[in-house]
Amino acid sequence: MRRIDPNKLELEERVVAVNRVAKVVKGGRRFRFAALVVVGDKNGHVGFGTGKAQEVPDAIRKAIEDAKKNLITVPIVGTTIPHEVIGHFGAGEIILKPASEGTGVIAGGPARAVLELAGISDILSKSIGSNTPINMVRATIDGLKQLKRAEEVAKLRGKTVEELLG
C-alpha cells in the first residue's frame, strides 16, 4: 500500500481523548499525558495517531505527527460507504452500514470523529464490546480498510460490474 503524502492534503485534526498516565517510582508517581488524535481531509483520507508527553500540547502535537504517518484512503460512494462491514480490534468491534442520503452520521464518540473526518456524511454504526477510545478508533479504521468499490471486486473476480450487481 502506497503512503499518502499529508502535505498535499488539507487535513483537519480532532482530539478524541487525552489521558493522564502515571509511572510509579520510589519517590511517588510521575505523570504524563497520552493523547489520541484523528486527522482527515473530509474527502476520503483519514488517519489516527497517539502521542505521549509531559505536557498536554506536546502530547497532542506528537499524536498529530503520528496520525499523518498513518493515513488511509476510504472508498466513498456518494455520501456513504459501498457496503456493510465489521471492524475488529482487540475486544472492540464496530458494525458499519451504508445509509440513505440525509441520515447523517449515526455513531458514538470516537467512531464519529473517524467517520466525519473521512468525509462520510451518511452511515449507521453500532459498537460492540470494548468501548475505550483507542479500541473504537482502531476498530473503525480496520472496518474502513476492508471497504472495496464494486469495480475493485469485479476486477478481482474477473467479471464486469453489471454481472456482479445482477
Curated annotation (Swiss-Prot):
Coiled coil: none annotated. It holds the Pfam family Ribosomal_S5_C. Residues 11-74 form the S5 DRBM domain. GO terms for biological process: translation. The gene is rpsE. GO terms for molecular function: rRNA binding; structural constituent of ribosome. GO terms for cellular component: small ribosomal subunit. Part of the 30S ribosomal subunit. Contacts proteins S4 and S8. InterPro entries: Ribosomal_Su5_D2-typ_SF, Ribosomal_uS5, Ribosomal_uS5_bac-type, Ribosomal_uS5_C, Ribosomal_uS5_N, Ribosomal_uS5_N_CS, Ribsml_uS5_D2-typ_fold_subgr. Keywords: Ribonucleoprotein, Ribosomal protein, RNA-binding, rRNA-binding. Belongs to the universal ribosomal protein uS5 family. This is Small ribosomal subunit protein uS5. With S4 and S12 plays an important role in translational accuracy. The N-terminal domain interacts with the head of the 30S subunit; the C-terminal domain interacts with the body and contacts protein S4. The interaction surface between S4 and S5 is involved in control of translational fidelity. PROSITE patterns: RIBOSOMAL_S5, S5_DSRBD. It comes from Anoxybacillus flavithermus (strain DSM 21510 / WK1).
